[in-house]
Amino acid sequence: MRAPSIFRSVLTLTSLSVGLSFAGVCAQAQDIGVDVGGAAGIFRPKNPEAKKRTNRPSPVVRRGSASRTTGATNAAVEDRIEDLLDKGNQFRDARRFAEAEAAYQSILKLKANSGRAAYGLGNIYSDQQRWEEAEAAYRNAAQWSPSDVDALVALSVVLVQPRTGAGNAKRFADAEAFARRAVQLEPKNAIAWDRLGVALQARGLFNNETEHAYRRAVELDPQFPVAYAHLARVLNRMGRRDEAQPLYERATQLAKDPATLNVIAESLQAEQQWQNSEPVLKRTLELDGKNPTALYLMGRMLVVFKRYRESEPYLKLATEVSPRAFQPFNLLGRTYLALNRFEEAEVTYERAAAFASPGDRKQLAGIYGFEGVGDGYMKAKKKPSAARAYQRALELDPGNKELEQRLAGAH
Protein backbone atom coordinates (compact mmCIF):
# COMPACT_ATOMS: atom_id res chain seq x y z
CA MET A 1 0.00 0.00 0.00
CA ARG A 2 1.39 3.33 -0.97
CA ALA A 3 1.89 5.89 1.79
CA PRO A 4 -1.36 7.79 2.14
CA SER A 5 -1.45 11.36 1.01
CA ILE A 6 -1.59 12.58 4.57
CA PHE A 7 1.64 14.29 3.87
CA ARG A 8 3.49 15.26 0.76
CA SER A 9 7.01 14.71 1.89
CA VAL A 10 8.57 18.03 2.23
CA LEU A 11 10.13 20.34 4.27
CA THR A 12 9.89 23.13 6.47
CA LEU A 13 12.77 24.53 8.17
CA THR A 14 14.06 22.45 10.97
CA SER A 15 14.60 23.80 14.36
CA LEU A 16 18.16 22.71 14.95
CA SER A 17 20.22 23.56 17.97
CA VAL A 18 23.62 23.97 16.42
CA GLY A 19 26.54 24.15 18.77
CA LEU A 20 29.22 25.86 16.74
CA SER A 21 32.64 26.85 17.91
CA PHE A 22 34.15 29.37 15.58
CA ALA A 23 37.65 28.57 16.74
CA GLY A 24 37.08 24.98 15.74
CA VAL A 25 33.57 24.40 14.56
CA CYS A 26 31.86 21.40 15.99
CA ALA A 27 28.23 21.15 15.02
CA GLN A 28 26.45 18.84 17.35
CA ALA A 29 23.51 17.35 15.53
CA GLN A 30 21.11 15.61 17.81
CA ASP A 31 18.95 12.62 17.09
CA ILE A 32 16.35 12.61 14.40
CA GLY A 33 13.18 13.89 15.74
CA VAL A 34 15.02 15.80 18.36
CA ASP A 35 17.05 18.60 16.99
CA VAL A 36 16.14 17.83 13.50
CA GLY A 37 12.63 18.43 14.20
CA GLY A 38 11.93 15.06 13.41
CA ALA A 39 14.67 15.29 11.12
CA ALA A 40 12.37 13.16 10.62
CA GLY A 41 10.97 13.81 8.31
CA ILE A 42 9.44 16.91 8.42
CA PHE A 43 6.54 16.53 6.10
CA ARG A 44 4.36 19.08 4.49
CA PRO A 45 0.86 18.19 5.58
CA LYS A 46 -1.70 18.14 2.84
CA ASN A 47 -4.27 20.91 2.76
CA PRO A 48 -7.60 20.48 4.55
CA GLU A 49 -10.17 19.18 2.13
CA ALA A 50 -12.67 21.69 0.83
CA LYS A 51 -15.91 19.94 -0.02
CA LYS A 52 -17.36 20.38 -3.45
CA ARG A 53 -20.31 22.69 -3.42
CA THR A 54 -23.60 21.64 -4.87
CA ASN A 55 -25.86 24.11 -6.55
CA ARG A 56 -28.61 24.33 -4.02
CA PRO A 57 -31.86 25.96 -5.09
CA SER A 58 -32.61 28.92 -2.91
CA PRO A 59 -35.50 27.97 -0.63
CA VAL A 60 -38.63 30.04 -0.92
CA VAL A 61 -39.02 31.94 2.32
CA ARG A 62 -42.62 32.47 3.33
CA ARG A 63 -43.84 34.77 6.03
CA GLY A 64 -43.51 33.10 9.41
CA SER A 65 -41.19 30.44 8.08
CA ALA A 66 -38.32 30.91 10.53
CA SER A 67 -36.97 27.38 10.07
CA ARG A 68 -36.63 27.84 6.32
CA THR A 69 -34.76 31.10 6.86
CA THR A 70 -32.42 29.41 9.32
CA GLY A 71 -31.80 26.57 6.88
CA ALA A 72 -30.95 28.97 4.09
CA THR A 73 -28.62 30.90 6.39
CA ASN A 74 -26.84 27.72 7.51
CA ALA A 75 -26.37 26.62 3.92
CA ALA A 76 -24.91 30.00 3.02
CA VAL A 77 -22.51 29.80 5.96
CA GLU A 78 -21.37 26.32 4.95
CA ASP A 79 -20.78 27.50 1.39
CA ARG A 80 -18.79 30.43 2.70
CA ILE A 81 -16.66 28.10 4.82
CA GLU A 82 -15.85 25.93 1.80
CA ASP A 83 -14.92 29.02 -0.22
CA LEU A 84 -12.60 30.24 2.54
CA LEU A 85 -10.99 26.82 2.88
CA ASP A 86 -10.32 26.72 -0.83
CA LYS A 87 -8.84 30.23 -0.76
CA GLY A 88 -6.71 29.43 2.27
CA ASN A 89 -5.36 26.33 0.56
CA GLN A 90 -4.52 28.24 -2.61
CA PHE A 91 -2.77 31.00 -0.67
CA ARG A 92 -0.78 28.42 1.29
CA ASP A 93 0.36 26.67 -1.89
CA ALA A 94 1.48 30.06 -3.22
CA ARG A 95 3.34 30.72 0.07
CA ARG A 96 1.13 33.74 0.70
CA PHE A 97 0.91 32.84 4.36
CA ALA A 98 -0.65 36.02 5.74
CA GLU A 99 -3.57 35.72 3.33
CA ALA A 100 -3.92 32.01 4.03
CA GLU A 101 -4.00 32.70 7.76
CA ALA A 102 -6.67 35.36 7.31
CA ALA A 103 -8.83 32.94 5.32
CA TYR A 104 -8.61 30.15 7.88
CA GLN A 105 -9.17 32.58 10.77
CA SER A 106 -12.30 33.85 9.02
CA ILE A 107 -13.70 30.32 9.12
CA LEU A 108 -13.29 30.19 12.89
CA LYS A 109 -15.37 33.34 13.16
CA LEU A 110 -18.16 31.52 11.34
CA LYS A 111 -17.65 28.16 13.04
CA ALA A 112 -15.60 28.37 16.21
CA ASN A 113 -14.75 24.66 16.45
CA SER A 114 -13.87 23.96 12.82
CA GLY A 115 -11.26 21.21 12.87
CA ARG A 116 -10.39 21.82 9.23
CA ALA A 117 -9.71 25.52 9.81
CA ALA A 118 -7.55 24.75 12.84
CA TYR A 119 -5.66 22.16 10.81
CA GLY A 120 -5.14 24.67 7.99
CA LEU A 121 -3.74 27.19 10.47
CA GLY A 122 -1.42 24.54 11.86
CA ASN A 123 -0.14 23.88 8.36
CA ILE A 124 0.81 27.47 7.60
CA TYR A 125 2.38 27.98 11.02
CA SER A 126 4.36 24.79 10.53
CA ASP A 127 5.45 25.93 7.07
CA GLN A 128 6.89 29.05 8.72
CA GLN A 129 8.40 27.16 11.68
CA ARG A 130 6.10 28.93 14.10
CA TRP A 131 6.10 25.79 16.20
CA GLU A 132 4.21 26.97 19.28
CA GLU A 133 1.38 28.39 17.19
CA ALA A 134 1.36 25.27 15.01
CA GLU A 135 1.12 23.05 18.07
CA ALA A 136 -1.80 25.03 19.49
CA ALA A 137 -3.66 24.94 16.17
CA TYR A 138 -3.10 21.22 15.62
CA ARG A 139 -4.16 20.43 19.20
CA ASN A 140 -7.42 22.25 18.48
CA ALA A 141 -7.82 20.28 15.27
CA ALA A 142 -7.22 16.98 17.08
CA GLN A 143 -9.69 17.96 19.82
CA TRP A 144 -12.41 19.11 17.45
CA SER A 145 -11.88 16.27 14.95
CA PRO A 146 -10.50 13.41 17.09
CA SER A 147 -10.60 10.83 14.29
CA ASP A 148 -8.73 13.03 11.78
CA VAL A 149 -5.52 11.10 11.17
CA ASP A 150 -4.04 13.98 9.16
CA ALA A 151 -4.28 16.25 12.20
CA LEU A 152 -2.90 13.60 14.57
CA VAL A 153 0.14 12.96 12.41
CA ALA A 154 0.75 16.66 11.79
CA LEU A 155 0.59 17.29 15.53
CA SER A 156 3.07 14.48 16.15
CA VAL A 157 5.42 16.08 13.62
CA VAL A 158 5.29 19.49 15.30
CA LEU A 159 5.69 18.11 18.80
CA VAL A 160 9.11 16.67 18.00
CA GLN A 161 10.41 20.08 16.99
CA PRO A 162 12.68 20.84 19.94
CA ARG A 163 12.46 24.17 21.61
CA THR A 164 15.01 25.64 23.92
CA GLY A 165 13.98 25.33 27.54
CA ALA A 166 11.74 22.98 29.48
CA GLY A 167 8.85 20.91 28.22
CA ASN A 168 10.48 18.84 25.48
CA ALA A 169 10.05 15.54 27.34
CA LYS A 170 6.28 15.99 27.63
CA ARG A 171 5.96 17.09 24.02
CA PHE A 172 7.91 14.05 22.82
CA ALA A 173 5.69 11.77 24.92
CA ASP A 174 2.61 13.47 23.45
CA ALA A 175 4.05 13.03 19.95
CA GLU A 176 4.27 9.30 20.57
CA ALA A 177 0.72 9.18 21.94
CA PHE A 178 -0.77 11.00 18.94
CA ALA A 179 1.19 8.83 16.49
CA ARG A 180 -0.10 5.72 18.26
CA ARG A 181 -3.66 7.01 17.96
CA ALA A 182 -3.10 7.54 14.24
CA VAL A 183 -1.80 3.97 13.83
CA GLN A 184 -4.77 2.60 15.76
CA LEU A 185 -7.20 4.51 13.54
CA GLU A 186 -5.40 3.56 10.31
CA PRO A 187 -3.18 0.51 10.93
CA LYS A 188 -2.15 0.38 7.27
CA ASN A 189 -1.01 3.99 7.17
CA ALA A 190 2.71 3.88 6.39
CA ILE A 191 3.31 7.51 7.31
CA ALA A 192 1.68 7.11 10.71
CA TRP A 193 4.00 4.18 11.45
CA ASP A 194 6.98 6.24 10.32
CA ARG A 195 5.97 9.08 12.62
CA LEU A 196 5.61 6.67 15.51
CA GLY A 197 9.22 5.65 14.92
CA VAL A 198 10.29 9.29 14.86
CA ALA A 199 8.46 10.01 18.11
CA LEU A 200 10.13 7.05 19.79
CA GLN A 201 13.51 8.28 18.59
CA ALA A 202 12.73 11.72 19.90
CA ARG A 203 12.43 10.10 23.31
CA GLY A 204 15.87 8.52 22.86
CA LEU A 205 14.47 5.04 22.21
CA PHE A 206 16.61 3.30 19.60
CA ASN A 207 15.25 -0.17 20.17
CA ASN A 208 13.29 -3.02 18.64
CA GLU A 209 9.99 -1.14 18.84
CA THR A 210 11.43 1.82 16.94
CA GLU A 211 12.91 -0.51 14.33
CA HIS A 212 9.57 -2.31 14.05
CA ALA A 213 7.69 0.95 13.42
CA TYR A 214 9.98 1.85 10.52
CA ARG A 215 9.99 -1.67 9.10
CA ARG A 216 6.20 -1.65 9.21
CA ALA A 217 6.26 1.61 7.24
CA VAL A 218 8.44 0.18 4.45
CA GLU A 219 6.42 -3.04 4.39
CA LEU A 220 3.24 -1.05 3.83
CA ASP A 221 4.89 1.15 1.22
CA PRO A 222 8.10 -0.25 -0.33
CA GLN A 223 8.46 3.00 -2.30
CA PHE A 224 8.58 5.21 0.83
CA PRO A 225 12.12 6.67 0.85
CA VAL A 226 11.73 8.62 4.09
CA ALA A 227 11.06 5.46 6.06
CA TYR A 228 14.15 3.81 4.56
CA ALA A 229 16.25 6.78 5.69
CA HIS A 230 14.79 6.61 9.18
CA LEU A 231 15.28 2.87 9.41
CA ALA A 232 18.89 3.33 8.33
CA ARG A 233 19.35 5.91 11.04
CA VAL A 234 18.05 3.71 13.83
CA LEU A 235 20.11 0.74 12.64
CA ASN A 236 23.19 2.96 12.66
CA ARG A 237 22.46 3.91 16.23
CA MET A 238 21.99 0.26 17.14
CA GLY A 239 25.45 -0.53 15.75
CA ARG A 240 24.20 -2.32 12.63
CA ARG A 241 25.93 -0.10 10.09
CA ASP A 242 26.29 -2.77 7.43
CA GLU A 243 22.50 -3.04 7.32
CA ALA A 244 22.04 0.73 7.34
CA GLN A 245 24.13 1.72 4.32
CA PRO A 246 22.04 -0.09 1.67
CA LEU A 247 18.93 1.52 3.15
CA TYR A 248 20.41 5.00 2.75
CA GLU A 249 21.23 4.13 -0.85
CA ARG A 250 17.70 2.86 -1.42
CA ALA A 251 16.25 6.04 0.06
CA THR A 252 18.37 8.19 -2.25
CA GLN A 253 17.35 6.14 -5.30
CA LEU A 254 13.67 6.51 -4.49
CA ALA A 255 13.79 10.21 -3.62
CA LYS A 256 12.20 12.28 -6.37
CA ASP A 257 11.19 15.48 -4.61
CA PRO A 258 12.86 18.17 -2.49
CA ALA A 259 11.11 17.15 0.70
CA THR A 260 12.34 13.59 0.63
CA LEU A 261 15.85 14.64 -0.29
CA ASN A 262 15.81 17.02 2.67
CA VAL A 263 14.92 14.19 5.01
CA ILE A 264 17.86 12.15 3.74
CA ALA A 265 20.21 15.12 4.05
CA GLU A 266 19.00 15.81 7.59
CA SER A 267 19.56 12.21 8.54
CA LEU A 268 23.07 12.21 7.08
CA GLN A 269 23.93 15.39 8.95
CA ALA A 270 22.58 13.96 12.17
CA GLU A 271 25.00 11.06 11.64
CA GLN A 272 27.83 13.60 11.16
CA GLN A 273 28.05 12.65 7.48
CA TRP A 274 28.21 16.31 6.53
CA GLN A 275 30.08 15.89 3.27
CA ASN A 276 27.67 13.23 2.03
CA SER A 277 24.75 15.59 2.62
CA GLU A 278 26.09 18.23 0.21
CA PRO A 279 25.29 16.47 -3.10
CA VAL A 280 21.84 15.55 -1.78
CA LEU A 281 21.13 19.18 -0.93
CA LYS A 282 22.42 20.33 -4.31
CA ARG A 283 19.89 18.02 -5.94
CA THR A 284 17.16 19.53 -3.80
CA LEU A 285 18.10 23.08 -4.74
CA GLU A 286 18.20 22.16 -8.42
CA LEU A 287 14.56 21.13 -8.04
CA ASP A 288 13.54 24.04 -5.80
CA GLY A 289 16.01 26.88 -5.49
CA LYS A 290 14.02 28.52 -2.70
CA ASN A 291 13.41 25.48 -0.55
CA PRO A 292 13.95 26.85 2.97
CA THR A 293 14.99 23.57 4.57
CA ALA A 294 17.59 22.86 1.91
CA LEU A 295 18.90 26.42 2.08
CA TYR A 296 19.26 26.21 5.84
CA LEU A 297 20.87 22.76 5.82
CA MET A 298 23.29 23.78 3.07
CA GLY A 299 24.26 26.89 5.02
CA ARG A 300 24.64 24.82 8.17
CA MET A 301 26.88 22.29 6.44
CA LEU A 302 29.10 25.05 5.04
CA VAL A 303 29.42 26.66 8.47
CA VAL A 304 30.50 23.32 9.92
CA PHE A 305 33.36 23.30 7.41
CA LYS A 306 34.11 26.98 8.13
CA ARG A 307 33.10 27.97 4.61
CA TYR A 308 31.40 31.05 5.98
CA ARG A 309 31.38 33.21 2.86
CA GLU A 310 29.79 30.39 0.89
CA SER A 311 27.17 29.86 3.60
CA GLU A 312 26.02 33.48 3.67
CA PRO A 313 23.94 33.55 0.45
CA TYR A 314 22.14 30.33 1.36
CA LEU A 315 21.26 31.56 4.83
CA LYS A 316 20.25 35.02 3.61
CA LEU A 317 17.86 33.49 1.11
CA ALA A 318 16.50 31.19 3.81
CA THR A 319 15.62 34.24 5.93
CA GLU A 320 13.89 35.83 2.96
CA VAL A 321 11.85 32.73 2.21
CA SER A 322 10.96 32.16 5.88
CA PRO A 323 11.13 35.65 7.40
CA ARG A 324 9.65 34.57 10.75
CA ALA A 325 11.89 31.57 11.43
CA PHE A 326 14.38 31.94 14.28
CA GLN A 327 17.09 29.44 13.29
CA PRO A 328 18.09 30.85 9.86
CA PHE A 329 18.56 34.33 11.37
CA ASN A 330 20.44 32.87 14.31
CA LEU A 331 22.87 30.91 12.14
CA LEU A 332 23.29 33.83 9.74
CA GLY A 333 24.21 36.00 12.72
CA ARG A 334 26.81 33.43 13.77
CA THR A 335 28.19 33.45 10.25
CA TYR A 336 28.64 37.22 10.35
CA LEU A 337 30.23 36.86 13.78
CA ALA A 338 32.76 34.38 12.39
CA LEU A 339 33.52 36.82 9.55
CA ASN A 340 34.06 39.68 12.05
CA ARG A 341 31.18 41.59 10.46
CA PHE A 342 29.87 42.68 13.82
CA GLU A 343 27.40 45.34 12.69
CA GLU A 344 25.63 42.85 10.42
CA ALA A 345 25.71 40.21 13.14
CA GLU A 346 24.09 42.63 15.57
CA VAL A 347 21.31 43.55 13.16
CA THR A 348 20.68 39.90 12.30
CA TYR A 349 20.55 38.81 15.94
CA GLU A 350 18.08 41.61 16.60
CA ARG A 351 15.82 40.23 13.90
CA ALA A 352 16.17 36.74 15.38
CA ALA A 353 15.16 38.08 18.80
CA ALA A 354 11.75 39.03 17.43
CA PHE A 355 10.91 35.34 16.93
CA ALA A 356 12.87 33.84 19.82
CA SER A 357 11.32 31.70 22.53
CA PRO A 358 12.37 32.39 26.14
CA GLY A 359 15.09 29.76 25.88
CA ASP A 360 16.25 31.10 22.54
CA ARG A 361 16.49 34.60 23.98
CA LYS A 362 18.99 33.41 26.56
CA GLN A 363 20.95 31.71 23.79
CA LEU A 364 20.98 34.96 21.81
CA ALA A 365 22.47 36.72 24.80
CA GLY A 366 25.48 34.40 24.89
CA ILE A 367 28.87 34.04 23.28
CA TYR A 368 27.31 33.14 19.93
CA GLY A 369 24.95 36.07 20.21
CA PHE A 370 25.09 39.62 21.53
CA GLU A 371 27.85 38.84 24.03
CA GLY A 372 30.00 37.65 21.14
CA VAL A 373 29.14 40.80 19.20
CA GLY A 374 30.16 42.92 22.19
CA ASP A 375 33.44 41.04 22.48
CA GLY A 376 34.10 41.68 18.81
CA TYR A 377 33.45 45.38 19.19
CA MET A 378 35.79 45.48 22.20
CA LYS A 379 38.58 43.90 20.17
CA ALA A 380 37.94 46.51 17.49
CA LYS A 381 38.14 49.21 20.21
CA LYS A 382 34.53 50.28 19.66
CA LYS A 383 33.47 50.58 23.27
CA PRO A 384 30.15 52.41 22.72
CA SER A 385 29.05 49.71 20.30
CA ALA A 386 30.26 47.01 22.69
CA ALA A 387 28.27 48.58 25.52
CA ARG A 388 25.16 48.60 23.33
CA ALA A 389 25.59 44.90 22.50
CA TYR A 390 26.22 43.91 26.13
CA GLN A 391 23.20 45.94 27.22
CA ARG A 392 21.04 44.10 24.71
CA ALA A 393 22.43 40.79 25.95
CA LEU A 394 21.43 41.73 29.50
CA GLU A 395 17.93 42.58 28.36
CA LEU A 396 17.69 39.06 26.95
CA ASP A 397 19.33 37.42 29.97
CA PRO A 398 18.67 39.67 32.99
CA GLY A 399 20.84 39.19 36.04
CA ASN A 400 23.76 37.57 34.20
CA LYS A 401 26.72 38.67 36.32
CA GLU A 402 29.31 38.05 33.62
CA LEU A 403 27.40 40.26 31.21
CA GLU A 404 27.11 42.94 33.87
CA GLN A 405 30.89 42.88 34.30
CA ARG A 406 31.46 43.09 30.55
CA LEU A 407 29.06 46.01 30.29
CA ALA A 408 30.87 47.81 33.10
CA GLY A 409 34.17 47.27 31.31
CA ALA A 410 32.79 48.77 28.12
CA HIS A 411 31.92 52.10 29.77
Residue ranges and their predicted role:
Residues V77-L110, N123-D127, T164-N168, V198, ...:
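Alpha-helical segment of the N-proximal tetratricopeptide repeat
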Residues A27-A66:
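N-terminal propeptides/low-complexity segments immediately following signal peptides
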Residues R95-A102, S106, D127-N140, R163-R181, ...:
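Structural signature of tandem alpha-helical TPR/SEL1-like repeats
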Residues D86, G120, A154, R195, ...:
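Canonical tetratricopeptide repeat
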Residues R80, S114, D148, N189, ...:
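Residue-level recognition of tetratricopeptide repeat
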Residues A117, A151, A192, A227, ...:
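TPR alpha-solenoid repeat register
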Residues L110, W144, L185, L220, ...:
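Structural marker of alpha-solenoid helical repeat scaffolds
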